[in-house]
């Protein structure tokens, strides 16, 4: 344990902080996008699950909302099978499932074509 590790927050706290930013509908889009990429960087199933919370809010203007959601979708699909458990967990607890279902479908179709 070095001196800097004392001041670093735990991965759980980092995920929770990024989750709050990614879900902020009235905040700056740059903050949401940076938080999304931070969650992708962390890369754990919990971080991906937190990232999926971006799909639970709507942002004005709707074109910005659509762009951000498309970007999150692409990044989740890139994770492939590593994102499946988080997607399934999200689908079991949330009502807004359009984007996560789309991600899961793309991941599973890609896997099917690779086999």
How does the language model describe each region?
Residues 14-19, 50-55, 86-88, 115:
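Buried hydrophobic core positions in alpha-solenoid tandem helical repeats
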């Amino acid at each position: 344990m070095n001196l800097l590790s004392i001041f670093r927050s735990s991965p759980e706290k980092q995920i929770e902080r990024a989750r709050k930013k990614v879900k902020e509908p009235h905040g700056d889009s740059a903050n949401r996008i940076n938080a999304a990429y931070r969650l992708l960087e962390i890369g754990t199933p919990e971080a991906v699950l937190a990232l999926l919370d971006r799909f639970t809010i709507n942002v004005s203007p709707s074109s910005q909302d659509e762009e951000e959601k498309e970007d999150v979708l692409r990044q989740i699909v890139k994770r492939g099978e590593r994102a499946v458990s988080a997607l399934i967990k999200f689908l079991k607890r949330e009502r807004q499932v359009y984007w996560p279902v789309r991600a899961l479908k793309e991941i599973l179709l890609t896997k099917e074509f690779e086999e």
